[in-house]
Amino acid sequence: MNQIEKTGELSASRFTVRDFTELVKIGIVNSNTITAFTGMWLAFQLNGISFIQNVDVIFFTIVGSALIVAASGAFNNVIDRDIDGIMERTKNRPTMTGKISGKRALMVALVLGVVGTIMLFMTTWQAGVLGVIGVFLYVVVYSLYAKRKLVSNTVIGSFSGAVPPLIGWFAVEPTFSIVPIMLFLVMFCWQPPHFYAIAIKRKEEYAAAGIPMLPVVKGIERTKKSMFFWVILLTILPFFMFDLGIVYVILATLLNIGWLALSIYGFKMEDSIKWAKWMFVYSLNYMTILFVAMVVISIFL
C-alpha cells in the first residue's frame, strides 16, 4: 500500500457527521423532505384523514423520503468523483478529500436506499414504487447519462426532483387528483430556472468539467430565455389549484409576477452573474414561501 492509499484509508476511517451530511447533500435532503411533507400534509387535510391517528404513516413517509433522497445524493457523489475535483464548489466533498472512500460511500448509499424504500412501502405500495422511480431517474437516467451527455440534462433531472411531493401524497391517499399533479408540476417547472441560475454563475467550472449545461453549450442569453419560459409556465399553475383556496392562488400569483419581472429584467441587465445570483435567491425564497403557505392555508380550508 502506497502513502496516498494509506492517507486515504486513514481519512476515511475518521469521517465526521459533517462529512456524512455533505456526502448525502443535506440541503437537498431537507428541501425534498419539506416537499414530501407538504404533499403528505395536503393529502391529510384535503381528504379529511386524521393526522394524529396516522403517526406511523407520517414517520415512515418523512424518514423514508429523506433516506432515499440521501441515498441518491450519495450515489451521485460516487458517480461524480472524476469531475468533482475540477469544480470549485465540489472539490472539497468528502469523496474528493478522501475522508469517505468511494467504496464506503457506495455502501452508505445502498443502505440508505434500501431502508428508505422499505419504509415507503410500509405506507402504500404506490409510495414505494414512486420512491424507486425517483432514485432510478436521478441516479441512472440523470447522473450516469443525461448530466454528461445532454444539454437538456437539467430538465431531465427535474423529473426526479418533482417526485417527493407525489410520494407524500400517495403515502396517505393512493389515488390521483389535481392537487398532487399540480405539486409535481410546480416542482418540475421550478427546477430549471433555479439550477440554470447556478449554471450561469458556475459556467466556467461546468465547461472545464465537460458538463454540457445550457449556458455552456447555448450561451447565457439563450439560458435567460429558457428561464423566462419556465417561469411563465409557473404563473399558469396556481389557476389549477383552487382546491387550496383563493388566498393561495393570489399569493402564488404575486410570487410568480415578481419572479417573472426579475426574469424580464435579466434581458436588460448587463451583469448576468449578479442577475443569476438574484434569480437563485428568489427561487429559494419562492419555494420556501410557497410550500409553507400550502401547509398553513390548508389548515383553514
Curated annotation (Swiss-Prot):
Catalysed conversion reaction: heme b + (2E,6E)-farnesyl diphosphate + H2O = Fe(II)-heme o + diphosphate
Keyword vocabulary terms for this entry: Cell membrane, Heme biosynthesis, Membrane, Transferase, Transmembrane, Transmembrane helix
Protein's pathway: Porphyrin-containing compound metabolism; heme O biosynthesis; heme O from protoheme: step 1/1
Stretch forming the signal peptide: none
Keyword Transmembrane: yes
Subunit comment: Interacts with CtaA.
Any Pfam family the entry gives: UbiA
Protein function: Converts heme B (protoheme IX) to heme O by substitution of the vinyl group on carbon 2 of heme B porphyrin ring with a hydroxyethyl farnesyl side group.
Highest taxon of source: Bacteria
Alphabetical list of Gene3D superfamilies matching this protein: UbiA prenyltransferase
EC number in record: 2.5.1.141
UniProt-listed HAMAP family: CyoE_CtaB
Protein's UniProt name: Protoheme IX farnesyltransferase
Top enzyme class: transferase
Transmembrane segments: 20-42, 55-75, 105-125, 126-146, 150-172, 176-198, 227-247, 249-269, 280-300
An annotated GO BP: heme O biosynthetic process
